[in-house]
């Protein structure tokens, strides 16, 4: 594989289909603009899919899992063993994303990039085991260069499987105790912002726990701060295996011409990193929701993203993105199924 494949050309949206979809929206039996952002969503999907009437029948969800060495600093309300335990829950159907994927009729795969504790082979889990989690980034880079490259490639491979399955939409989810700390550290570096502005409770820390997390991140930023201008170095030094895989998946989606629906804070930080690695991938990213973590809003603003939902979510797993899929499907259904003024013999507003 090319060591910097993410720099390869991204697909371009179809300007002719964008124009035709916009013209169709203006002919539908409604006041122009009355369906608000649903109209623009349908137009954007038409341009990205190269179809005047887009559809989202086949959805692919991949949950990437990996552990984080920074958990040793006491930054999580949950023990590290939960990461591996949740992998079992995913494939047994008991996790939130498992339920939501079933409801959507979506394909669900789980990729173990590196849990801290070895797991038995679980049916339905791809055990890559690139490392036993990351290193503690207040002491050393979270990942070696090769580990980070392999994690990026794992995301790319997941999109390749989604493409082979004929999927029209890719959702990446994540699982990893400590990954809101890694995401916040990356966001601080990429946005050149203090930890106090971007750190939140994660899985449920109290105020003192949040303050401690911010202090831990500041220590990491002091250690790795000289590399802030390099998104790959920021990813490998402060990120996680699952965050790297998410970034790789978003980049691959743009290169293959598949729309990606980005979930919450951690996924949005991975998306920000992907955009810094290859700015052209931004057009292929839709953003599902604005989550409860305070840093999420700042990351969305940096991406000029307008999330579809605002429900106070902070679960991860891809759950917020899955919840937004019915809204996208309804936007497509309205765009394709409504009659035009001419078809319905309804008088349009005078030109």
Swiss-Prot record:
Pathway per the UniProt entry: Nucleoside biosynthesis; alpha-ribazole biosynthesis; alpha-ribazole from 5,6-dimethylbenzimidazole: step 1/2
UniProt-recorded Gene Ontology molecular function terms: nicotinate-nucleotide-dimethylbenzimidazole phosphoribosyltransferase activity
Broad class of enzyme this protein falls into: transferase
The UniProt record lists the keyword Transferase: yes
This protein's UniProt keywords: Cobalamin biosynthesis, Glycosyltransferase, Transferase
Protein task: Catalyzes the synthesis of alpha-ribazole-5'-phosphate from nicotinate mononucleotide (NAMN) and 5,6-dimethylbenzimidazole (DMB).
NCBIfam families according to UniProt: cobT_DBIPRT, PRK00105.1
Protein name as catalogued: Nicotinate-nucleotide--dimethylbenzimidazole phosphoribosyltransferase
Organism lineage: Bacteria, Pseudomonadati, Pseudomonadota, Gammaproteobacteria, Pseudomonadales
């Amino acid at each position: 594989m090319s060591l910097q494949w993410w720099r390869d050309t991204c697909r371009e949206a179809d300007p002719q289909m964008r124009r035709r979809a916009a013209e169709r929206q203006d002919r539908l039996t409604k006041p122009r603009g009355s369906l608000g952002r649903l109209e623009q969503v349908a137009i954007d999907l038409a341009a990205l899919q190269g179809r005047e009437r887009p559809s989202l029948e086949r959805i692919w969800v991949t949950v990437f899992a990996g552990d984080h060495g920074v958990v040793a600093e006491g930054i999580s309300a949950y023990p590290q063993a939960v990461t591996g335990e949740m992998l079992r829950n995913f494939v047994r159907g008991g996790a939130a994303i498992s339920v939501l994927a079933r409801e959507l009729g979506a394909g669900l795969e789980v990729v173990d990039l590196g849990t801290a504790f070895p797991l038995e082979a679980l049916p339905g889990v791809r055990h890559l085991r690139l490392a036993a989690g990351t290193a503690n980034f207040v002491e050393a880079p979270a990942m070696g260069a090769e580990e980070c490259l392999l994690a990026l490639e794992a995301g790319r491979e997941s999109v390749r499987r989604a493409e082979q399955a004929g999927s029209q939409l890719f959702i990446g989810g994540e699982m990893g105790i400590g990954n809101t700390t890694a995401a916040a550290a990356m966001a601080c570096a990429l946005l050149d912002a203090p930890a106090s502005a971007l750190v939140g409770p994660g899985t449920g820390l109290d105020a003192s726990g949040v303050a401690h997390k911010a202090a831990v991140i500041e220590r990491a930023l002091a250690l790795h701060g000289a590399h802030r201008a390099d998104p790959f170095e920021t990813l490998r030094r402060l990120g996680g295996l699952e965050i790297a895989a998410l970034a790789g998946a978003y980049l691959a989606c743009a290169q293959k011409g598949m729309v990606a629906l980005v979930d919450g804070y951690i996924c949005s930080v991975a998306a920000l990193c992907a955009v810094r690695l290859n700015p052209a991938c931004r057009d292929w990213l839709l953003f599902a929701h604005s989550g409860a973590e305070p840093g999420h809003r700042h990351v969305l603003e940096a991406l000029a993203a307008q999330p579809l939902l605002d429900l106070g979510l902070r679960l991860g797993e891809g759950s917020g993105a899955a919840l937004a899929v019915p809204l996208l499907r309804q936007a497509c259904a309205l765009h394709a199924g409504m009659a035009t003024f001419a078809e319905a013999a309804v008088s349009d507003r005078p030109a």
